């Protein structure tokens, strides 16, 4: 059956404790120490991400019926979808969108693996949509680009300027200053120990503007 959203994220970095403290400082996560030197970040009763030691990068866990590995640093995890178009609206600090960045699109793979439909977006961008619970709703995006590869993670914030100021206070970097794109008003940031991601201001739902387009 079609995957209708995320179970969770996972961030691999060289310094998990320092990295999760950074994101907690910017996004207000509640941090729980897990076994093996890993950590988890929560907003209320919803898990946002695990932070573990390893080669730097984000891993995306989609909800589904059969746990399995997928390509491009992603997996299917059995259980209730916590973040997606049919889940509760994203709160500050929570995932609110994901985009696959790739120079070699393979939309047929994701359609076959996750039961998605491909819908046109803009230029080199398409939407992957799920009809699992009714009319199709966007679950993820795909951007054709040779500038980056892998899953780009979006996290919700209430005040983009304040969040960027906090990034700088905590020795992170603002890679892209606040600007408006089709998804909404965003900034790109990176912590002092890695974990580049996008902040999206006050998304109206999963996918920001895509949720209401």
Briefly describe each language-model feature range.
Residues 5-15, 38-47, 52-103, 119-135, 141-144, 170-213, ...:
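Vicinal oxygen chelate
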């Amino acid at each position: 059956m079609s995957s209708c959203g995320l179970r969770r994220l996972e961030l691999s970095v060289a310094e998990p404790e320092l990295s999760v403290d950074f994101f907690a400082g910017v996004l207000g996560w509640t941090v729980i120490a897990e076994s093996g030197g890993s950590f988890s970040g929560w907003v209320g009763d919803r898990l946002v991400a695990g932070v573990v030691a390893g080669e730097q990068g984000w891993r995306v866990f989609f909800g589904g019926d059969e746990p399995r590995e997928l390509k491009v640093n992603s997996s299917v995890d059995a259980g209730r979808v916590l973040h997606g178009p049919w889940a509760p609206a994203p709160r500050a600090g929570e995932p609110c969108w994901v985009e696959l960045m790739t120079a070699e699109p393979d939309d047929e793979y994701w359609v076959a693996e996750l039961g998605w439909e491909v819908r046109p977006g803009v230029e080199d961008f398409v939407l992957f949509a799920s009809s699992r619970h009714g009319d199709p709703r966007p679950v993820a995006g795909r951007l054709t680009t040779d500038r980056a590869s892998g899953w780009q993670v979006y996290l919700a914030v209430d005040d983009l300027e304040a969040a960027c100021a906090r990034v700088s206070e905590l020795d992170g970097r603002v890679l892209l200053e606040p600007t408006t794109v089709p998804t909404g008003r965003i900034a790109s940031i990176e912590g002092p120990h890695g974990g580049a991601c996008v902040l999206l201001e006050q998304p109206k739902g999963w996918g920001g503007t895509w949720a209401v387009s």
